[in-house]
Amino acid sequence: GETGADYLIFQWGLGLPATSALMSVVLVAILWLQFRQDRYRPWVYWLAVTMVSVVGTLITDSLVDTYGVPLPLTTVVFAVALIATFAIWYGREGTLSIHAIDTPPREGFYWLAILFTFALGTAAGDLMAERLGLGYLSSTLLFGAGIAVVAALWRLDIIGPVTGFWQASLNFFKTLRLPLSS
């Protein structure tokens, strides 16, 4: 997300606000296409994931760089938004399993959770790498270790597959974007 957004901002010269608006419109169109699918189509799904990653990154970057919202605050806000999404999703649907995303409301909750995961990953990754001074390599290794811990907890049956998936996803998105954004 970070790499794609930076390319549009700097190479195309669009700037952060215009890039954010353009990519948000593209995301809405791609999600519209995704919601119209009657089965899993990898190219549509992964295009949606890619666009959600770009827009999630742009949301955080816009809040921090354009509006001056501090990274610690954006990290907390996106963490709370993600937790609230999970709570409402579970309260309405009774599951957070990716294997039970078989209705439009569940798919909507899924994509909202993924969007907040990318926004949170950008905020937390930048907070650790830049603001806390850990650098990109150390932050990447730390989040990578988080994935290993989640995998071990799942393997030892300490956490279930749903918790494991979402925890690993959050750490994966943070780990993936850090080296690519440097």
Give residue spans per PLM region.
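Alpha-helical transmembrane segments of multi-pass integral membrane proteins
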Residues: G1, A48-T57, V77-Y90, P105-D126, ...
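Structural signature of hydrophobic alpha-helical transmembrane segments
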Residues: Q11-V25, G68-L82, G133-A145
